[in-house]
């Protein structure tokens, strides 16, 4: 993997990631394909509206269907028929979300499979080995997702464990002679000194890119923005900056303005299935009775398949009846909206007009929910 920084507009960055499998223009948004599938979408549909890279989850794939099943096809790309790059999450977040069913030690985490209750152990080495077998183009280190809220002593202890695991992840990645990219993950909760310490240690270890973890875990928007105000500048300018698990369209705009290059989030797909649709003027809750006889299109500014062919009334009907087509049409629109938003931001940075873009974006987003 190679990253080229092409242009900056204040702190906002316009770049390109070059993989053997193709190029990814940044800032970039990755739809989440947890089990090797972006829900309701074919790979061809994803590509058609600008998706360049997707995210898979090594924890879930290792349990279902199992790494042996994926390897029987070749790798994860072959298994799901996706021709572009794939980033895989290490599984750290998922393991720690199991709560009382898992036990953390210096070596790693013991837990029971959410599938059948079987005992499983996962540490940095196991996670890196799984991601190598999946053929991930970007491998993530295994870390502890710091709980929120937590006192500073707890956050510090968690961060130090993650840093030791980061070194072990790097050592295993090198031992396997994996030529694909490996990203570190900055932790440290809401504490600036700990975040800066985490970033500095990861830079010293040496990674191909750096992710910011431990955000969008329950903190306020103000707390998240405060971290983004100082943290990106602590990371090397020639390396990718990835904000994990974020977020709303407004979150993406704020983060790009502060120097973030990559994002992933389940929001556009999950919200689509629940009838929350992102538009140029705000969120449309398509189940609302007001749309029963509304024959207008969802978003007059959108050129997606859904907006070119169907009315709000029809989408309302599909959502009320829980029709599979409704989930598909909603997902097509939300993902198209996200990818078009990223395209607009890339163009704004290229033309040194990001501030103008941001002002117009907020002027249009006049309502949170319609």
UniProtKB/Swiss-Prot annotation:
Gene3D superfamilies: Queuine tRNA-ribosyltransferase-like. SUPFAM superfamilies: tRNA-guanine transglycosylase. Residues 245-251, 269-273 are annotated as: RNA binding. Its EC number is 2.4.2.29. It comes from the Bacteria. InterPro entries: ArchSynthase1/Queuine_TRR (IPR050076), TGT (IPR004803), TGT-like_sf (IPR036511), tRNA_ribo_trans-like (IPR002616). Pfam families: TGT. Zn(2+) binds at residues 302, 304, 307, 333. GO terms for molecular function: metal ion binding; tRNA-guanosine(34) queuine transglycosylase activity. One of its GO terms (biological process) is tRNA wobble guanine modification. Its cofactor is Zn(2+). Keywords: Glycosyltransferase, Metal-binding, Queuosine biosynthesis, Transferase, tRNA processing, Zinc. The active site is at 89 (proton acceptor), 264 (nucleophile). GO terms for cellular component: cytosol. It catalyses: 7-aminomethyl-7-carbaguanine + guanosine(34) in tRNA = 7-aminomethyl-7-carbaguanosine(34) in tRNA + guanine. The keyword Glycosyltransferase applies. Binds 1 zinc ion per subunit. It is an enzyme of class 2 (transferase). Pathway: tRNA modification; tRNA-queuosine biosynthesis. Substrate binds at residues 89-93, 143, 187, 214. Catalyzes the base-exchange of a guanine (G) residue with the queuine precursor 7-aminomethyl-7-deazaguanine (PreQ1) at position 34 (anticodon wobble position) in tRNAs with GU(N) anticodons (tRNA-Asp, -Asn, -His and -Tyr). Catalysis occurs through a double-displacement mechanism. The nucleophile active site attacks the C1' of nucleotide 34 to detach the guanine base from the RNA, forming a covalent enzyme-RNA intermediate. The proton acceptor active site deprotonates the incoming PreQ1, allowing a nucleophilic attack on the C1' of the ribose to form the product. Homodimer. Within each dimer, one monomer is responsible for RNA recognition and catalysis, while the other monomer binds to the replacement base PreQ1. Belongs to the queuine tRNA-ribosyltransferase family. This is Queuine tRNA-ribosyltransferase. It comes from Vesicomyosocius okutanii subsp. Calyptogena okutanii (strain HA). The gene is tgt.
């Amino acid at each position: 993997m190679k990253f080229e920084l092409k242009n900056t507009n204040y702190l906002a960055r316009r770049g390109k990631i070059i993989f053997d499998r193709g190029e990814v223009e940044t800032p970039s948004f990755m739809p989440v394909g947890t089990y090797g599938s972006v829900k309701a979408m074919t790979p061809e549909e994803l590509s058609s509206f600008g998706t360049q890279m997707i995210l898979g989850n090594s924890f879930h794939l290792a349990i279902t269907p199992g790494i042996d099943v994926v390897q029987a096809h070749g790798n994860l790309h072959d298994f799901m028929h996706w021709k572009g790059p794939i980033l895989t999450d290490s599984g750290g977040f998922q393991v720690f979300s199991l709560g009382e069913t898992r036990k953390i030690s210096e070596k790693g985490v013991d837990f029971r499979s959410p599938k059948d209750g079987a005992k499983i152990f996962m540490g940095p080495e196991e996670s890196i080995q799984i991601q190598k077998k999946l053929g991930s183009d970007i491998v993530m280190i295994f870390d502890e997702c710091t709980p929120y809220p937590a006192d500073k002593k707890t956050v510090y202890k968690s961060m130090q464990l993650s840093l030791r695991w980061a070194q072990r992840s790097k050592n295993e990645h090198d031992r396997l002679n994996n030529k694909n990219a490996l990203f570190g993950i900055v932790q440290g909760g809401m504490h600036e000194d700990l975040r800066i310490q985490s970033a500095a240690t990861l830079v010293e270890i040496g990674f191909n890119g750096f992710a910011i973890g431990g955000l969008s875990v329950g903190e306020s928007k103000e707390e998240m923005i405060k971290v983004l105000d100082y943290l990106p500048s602590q990371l090397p300018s020639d390396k990718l900056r990835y904000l994990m698990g974020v977020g709303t369209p407004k979150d993406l705009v704020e983060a790009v303005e502060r120097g973030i290059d990559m994002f992933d989030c389940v929001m556009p797909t999950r919200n689509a299935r629940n009838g929350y649709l992102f538009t140029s003027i705000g969120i449309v809750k398509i189940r609302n009775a007001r749309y029963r006889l509304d024959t207008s299109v969802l978003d007059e500014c959108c050129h997606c398949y859904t907006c070119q062919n169907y009315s709000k009334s029809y989408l309302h009907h599909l959502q009320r009846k829980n029709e599979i087509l409704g989930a598909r049409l909603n997902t097509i629109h939300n993902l198209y909206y996200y990818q078009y938003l990223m395209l607009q931001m890339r163009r704004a940075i290229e033309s040194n007009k990001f501030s103008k873009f941001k002002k117009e974006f907020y002027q249009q987003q006049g309502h949170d929910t319609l």
